[in-house]
């Protein structure tokens, strides 16, 4: 089983968690990383998932295979590069970075490290895509 860590539990992080947790026998959220001041910490007793407040400690956990980043774009470069350096595969919500140069650096580093890097940009329910699917 591929064990993932979800970083960020704001509106989009909660949607990702709800959409993916427990839906596959091949992957699971083993850890959720929250800010120490997160109101979501009050929900911790309800979860079967480990909750931590330190990104670095999660990256040091050898049982975590990949990181799902649902964090503000301003931190993406640092968070993605740290995950790659720790040997974790990365799914990051758009945008990958704040500048083209940062994005190119991230892609080069992940490629050299042979780490899977994916950027989320899902529009399958947008009206134009729904119409295209209907016509195909």
Language model segments and positions:
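Short, Asp-centered acidic motifs that coordinate Mg2+ and/or phosphate
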Residues: 31, 66, 116
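Beta-loop-alpha module in the N-terminal Rossmann-like domain of NAD(P)-dependent dehydrogenases
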Residues: 49-109
